[in-house]
Amino acid sequence: MVGTAEGGAERAVRRWVDAAGGRLVLDGGLATELEANGADLNDPLWSAKCLLSSPHLIRKVHMDYLEAGANIIITASYQATIQGFESKGFSKEQSENLLTKSVQIALEAREMFLKEHLEKSTPIQHPILVAAALGSYGAYLADGSEYSGDYGEAGTKEFLKDFHRRRLQVLAEAGPDLIAFETIPNKLEAQAYVELLEECNINIPSWLSFNSKDGVHVVSGDSLIECATIADKCAKVGAVGINCTPPRFIHGLILSIRKVTDKPILIYPNSGERYDGEKKEWVESTGVSDGDFVSYVNEWCKDGAALIGGCCRTTPNTIRAIHRTLNQGCHKHQLPVA
């Protein structure tokens, strides 16, 4: 386990970035790929439903992203919570075991991928990492509030800490390389996360990733700069960034984050399609093609992004194109030095 005392989390992420040649490639959308492989995700558990019904599909999607060039695969735990599983009739122990299973599946996929390439005499020389995903409280509610940050009466820091505490501990104990706090919609939840990292003494690097719908603020209306500052001040946070946000906003968001932190910046936008929180569906024909998506990559590199991938509605083809673009020269852009 990588220590995170005195900036160790940031150093760990930078070592991985350097070992990959200057940039790390994240994977892409999980839920849409599971659906493309036949999974039925019409459930509040969303992709976490497959931990119960079809773990083999999760493993396959992880493998598809690794074959496409991803250095980091993110577990199917974004919407997996103890409270959510208990609402389905599972005991606390069973719920915790399902969280652990999400990490185990990703670790198995990595082992299979490395073994296959070793047997082909094409051993993998770059880092292959597993990030355990923690979605926001709004993701558990499955009512679209992860895209608004409006939690109503539940919107207190202590409530959020109590909600996430055991989930964070279980995922960290399962053995991932990183903890990924994803799609953070407001400043309050970011503060809850960094306090939990300290209180629970989580000794593996984490990242905090926010979402924006206007290119200036996080979706709640809170200042992105203030949110990034919270992440910057926590030694257990190794990277700060943006996910589930249209590609056209990323340039300005990276520049805003760089004003307040020297930590590595990660970005994994969605396809640009608009999500209808009431209907719980993506609005067709509102996004960009893989070609248009990848056309932004060189700009993001110049801006200083160190970890680049995709979020909702991106596919292994998107990640393959990002990987190809990075190999064609994006690495030559110098990263900011801490």
UniProtKB/Swiss-Prot annotation:
Keywords: Amino-acid biosynthesis, Metal-binding, Methionine biosynthesis, Methyltransferase, S-adenosyl-L-methionine, Transferase, Zinc. GO terms for molecular function: S-methylmethionine-homocysteine S-methyltransferase activity; zinc ion binding. One of its GO terms (biological process) is methionine biosynthetic process. InterPro entries: Betaine-hCys_S-MeTrfase_BHMT (IPR017226), HCY_dom (IPR003726), HCY_dom_sf (IPR036589), Hcy_S-methyltransferase (IPR051486). It catalyses: S-methyl-L-methionine + L-homocysteine = 2 L-methionine + H(+). It holds the Pfam family S-methyl_trans. The keyword DNA damage does not apply. Zn(2+) binds at residues 244, 311-312. Disulfide bonds: none annotated. SUPFAM superfamilies: Homocysteine S-methyltransferase. It is an enzyme of class 2 (transferase). Residues 12-326 form the Hcy-binding domain. It comes from the Eukaryota. Its EC number is 2.1.1.10. Transmembrane segments: none annotated. Its cofactor is Zn(2+). PANTHER family: HOMOCYSTEINE S-METHYLTRANSFERASE 3, ZGC:172121. Catalyzes methyl transfer from S-methylmethionine (SMM) to adenosyl-L-homocysteine (AdoMet). SMM degradation (by HMT-1, HMT-2, HMT-3 and HMT-4) and biosynthesis (by MMT1) constitute the SMM cycle in plants, which is probably required to achieve short term control of AdoMet level. Monomer. This is Homocysteine S-methyltransferase 3. It comes from Zea mays (Maize). The lineage of its organism: Eukaryota, Viridiplantae, Streptophyta, Embryophyta, Tracheophyta. The gene is HMT-3.
